[in-house]
Amino acid sequence: MDRILKLLTWPAAVFIAGILLWYEQYKLTGNQGSVWLFTVLSDWLGIHGYEKPFRLGVGTAEIVGSILVVLPWTRIPGAALCLGIMSGAIFFHTVSPLGIDPYHDGGQLFQEACEVWLCSAFILFAYRREAVAMVERIFGIHLPRIA
């Protein structure tokens, strides 16, 4: 069963990279919609005028996550990074003035964030033993064994 789950991480990783890299063209080129979205967020957070570093920082993190999740030897940290980024996206869409449908397109951006989050969580589940071992190695702690 674990072998099948690990094989299924390939399409999940490609899906994650495809979605994240598709939106980079908007974040990194200063697309009007992307600038508006990050301006709303930075103003809501009380850090007025920091739209550009916020937008470029998220975009850069998404590119790094996309690369890491596709490479088999870095899939675990890549999935963890993508899960964290998408957790932030989902959080800000649900609690900030953005809402889940900021572009009035039926909430496509929010839906894709949820899909990327689910694929990232699936990858971490498929590699759960390796992920736990990695955390133990990095932090020098012992975690309870999971099935």
Region annotations inferred by a language model:
Residues 1-147:
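Membrane-interface extramembranous regions
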